[in-house]
Swiss-Prot record:
Pfam families: Anticodon_1, tRNA-synt_1, tRNA-synt_1_2, tRNA-synt_1g. It catalyses: tRNA(Leu) + L-leucine + ATP = L-leucyl-tRNA(Leu) + AMP + diphosphate. Keywords: Aminoacyl-tRNA synthetase, ATP-binding, Cytoplasm, Ligase, Nucleotide-binding, Protein biosynthesis. This is Leucine--tRNA ligase. The gene is leuS. It is found in: Cytoplasm. Its EC number is 6.1.1.4. A motif ('HIGH' region) lies at residues 42-52.
Amino acid sequence: MNIKYDVQKIEKQAQKYWKEKKSFEVIEDYSKEKYYCLSMFPYPSGRLHMGHVRNYSIGDVISRFQRMQGKNVMQPIGWDGFGLPAENAALKNKESPAKWTYKNINYMKTQLNQLGFGYDWAREITTCHPKYYRWEQWLFIKLFKKNLIYKKKAIVNWDPVDQTVLANEQVINGRGWRSNALIEKKEISQWFIRITNYAEELLNDLDKLYGWPDPVKIMQKNWIGKSIGLEITFSRRNSDPLIIYTTRPDTLMGVTYLAISFEHPLALESGKNNYQVQSFIEKCKTIQTSEILNEIMDKKGIDSGFKCIHPITNNEVPIWITNFVLMSYGTGAIMSVPAHDKRDFKFAKKYGIFIKQVINKNESIDKGPIINKGKLFNSEEFSGMDFNQAYESIAKTLIEKNLGNKKINYRLRDWGISRQRYWGCPIPIVNCKYCGSVTVKVKDLPVILPEKVKFYDVSSPIKKMPNFYQTICPKCGSKAHRETDTFDTFFESSWYFARHTCNNNNNAMLDKRVNYWLEVDQYIGGVEHSILHLLYARFFNKLLRDEGLIKYDEPFKNLLTQGMVLKNGVKMSKSKGNTVDPTKMIKKYGADTVRLFILFAAPPMQDLEWNNSGLEGAHRFIKKVYRLVSIYINDSKDYIVNHLNINFLNKTQKHIRRKIHQNLVKITDDINRRYTFNTAISTLMESVDIINKFTKTDTQSIALRSESINIILLTLSPITPHICHYLWLKLGNKKAIINEPWPKVDLKALIESEVQIIIQVDGKLRDKMMMMINTDKEILESEVLSNKNIIKFTKNKNIIKIIIIHNKLINIVTK
């Protein structure tokens, strides 16, 4: 065997074998336990980055390990093909988004193969291909007919850079999730899907996700934002009432003003005849009003001049127009209780509004509001009640007066799914002046997005293409216009996990194979997708279930959220100029080294700091394994390597074998249960060092080295598959290591024949001795008392008694 580690030759040989043998292609096999491992598919941006490499290395280790457990493992891959970067590249490079996207897919596919990931390429999907997106158009039509899809004018989040609408979930700290531009508010006709119809189920089913990290579930729970409260009507003389929602009806008697959104119809009415109000509203329109930004922005308002009637006291309450109440949340109006709310308190102090305390009589509001619940006072017939009593009593009173009712509210809003961009799935709607919005006939699907387009600015080219948008109404046959908005790209990524199971079915969205493979046993991706993608995918899963296409309530049984890859303490990004090209690292060190380092440098759930010295260390370890096997092959060439006979092992050999099998137990647990691949690798390194030092060449030693090296290669193979494939065959094995099972622990090897005994004199540690397990008391005492060190500490002393803790400790008590 060549003593030189030729990394490029070895890795190409392994990859050629897997490709020719179709090692990772699978079909449904009901005689085996299935295992579906899926990493979040990449956007084809042009090059893989180290975040991709980390994500997919984790998935590959899990997949290969589960395969070695005898399971029928599917690990597919695909491409999240639609998106704004393709349009930006089209403007910059003067090439179509389609050409740019498919070119990137080809390059990134080569990179994935160079890294040795065990994907079933026969299940590859590309979301920008009509074969894929025709089925989400089909689903859209189904949902439209069930009234789960609707169109309305709405105040939306408008990204001025990307020139498109963003869902609430896509606004991060008041900025666009892609462009980072400050988001504006704009009224526009939008398509929505009724995700709120599933709010309760999405919330309750979080309890079924035992294999999900708690922080992700908490984020989704908070985003859905269920609250239980009262809907209260504040009447207005000779006008429509204001309806508000509150979770603190116990503070109702402390209401001293109502706050409404500057977009509220009442605010607009007030502004018609009041220049100051009109000016205030215009200023509000220019500021950013995302929910998160509202927490830090300066709270401003103006008296509308209108008043409403308190539902219990019948006193008049002023209505203030504000810049912080969201029209998109509830009714766009809230009751304000400055004595018991921080924001209301500051606002009231700022504008000199009356403050009325109604909770906890013995506490003062001089320094600030009283937020906590307590006993009511100054509240007429409700005085003296606690929160629960007041809640029920006030609710009863309001219901009797027909001025209120109990209500469950959600923070979650219906998902705005239309985008004013080109590179997305066409919405299968025809707009007819006679029939309104009409769905395309199913037989006419897919509505194909024209791919040969030219970009002159950020606007969508299909809006200027009559040959695309001019059509006939499917209902009445009149001339009509095709919808030129496209789906939010999260539409595609919300169901791809299911399509992987039957991607070659051209006659149906899904077929019975989906119920063999789902649920996804292990899903892997970044925690930044907790609210967006993961919530939408759960929602789509329920839509597909209700269409009778799948039988499961949830798509992902277990979720692993890996940390980011950092360099110099910050996330790798092109803008920061701190990226590392995986292809260059593969050419220099090999794919196995890159995989090993990225799995060893940190636990998968934590951020990983990239450093070249760590990469060098990983490369040295692989070369050490290569040399270990090379030396063994040379040492054993004159032997017929027999199965190990444990009855003939000497003390040293038994100790080495015990340690190898103890390490096997730990490695198995680290990979299978704990997903701490870094500690599994550390233990593997320990095993390599043990066998490296054990160079004896007698028959039993050769057999022990053979067993140990086999265990090392088998357990290392999911992590560094290329070198293990090569060395396994060099050892003379007939089957490739990819087809071998995980090694079994010999429980007998774990049994200790000796134990370490702690020896104390008068409670102080004086020595340690190795003794046979369950040594007789008389023999143990004799051995200890004849120990030179113990003789020194007991000299000229009377031994009163000897205390023995079985197989652990002996304490000699003297006087």
